[in-house]
Amino acid sequence: MACTKVSIPKPYGYYRITVPDTAYVPFEQQYPAYPYTFDLSANAVVQLQDKEPYWINIYYPSLDATVHCSYKSVRKNLRELTNDALDFVYRNSSFATSIPEREYNHPEANVHGVLFDLEGNTASSCQFFVTDSTRHFFRASVYCNCPPNADSLAPVYEYLRKDVIRMVESFEWK
């Protein structure tokens, strides 16, 4: 009996993720020609996208996460743009445990939109769109560059969610 080794299962270990403190800078300081502005995290790097005018990625190097942002001019196609944004959200619905929605209305800035929290092991943890309903439409979605695991990525998701909420609440058309 003394020669027999007893196997003991070992628990899975995960990296400890520490999220940085954040400060914000106006997006328009770096990109004054864009038709929108919002508060941008000082921990993020804006990557311009040449697929379409005014498309950007907001990359968080310390978290290896990206907020993919697209902009479209509204040309009597608001319903189509809104439906496309909703399609992107609900493509993840089979993996989401729930998708709470939060409406945003800032009449003084003519900004109206919806924020979606995709809970569970989804590729995108948070998405939103905002519009003025006549000229501008902006959509964004958050992605981490790793397999989705809501439990281990919870600190990252919460940090990015707070940044996205700050984006939406400070969003303005120019």
Q: Model-flagged regions — what are they?
A:
Residues 63, 74, 121, 145-147:
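Solvent-exposed coil/turn segments that connect beta secondary-structure elements
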Residues 1-2:
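C-terminal motif of bacterial Sec signal peptides marking the signal peptidase cleavage site
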Residues 67-76, 127, 150-158:
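Second-shell loop/turn segments in exported
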Residues 11-32:
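Post-signal peptide N-terminal segment of mature Sec-exported envelope proteins
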Residues 31-87:
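Secretory pathway targeting signatures of secreted, lumenal, and periplasmic proteins
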Residues 83-139:
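Signature of long, low-cysteine stretches enriched in small and polar/charged residues
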Residues 44, 141-174:
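Surface-exposed amphipathic alpha-helical segments
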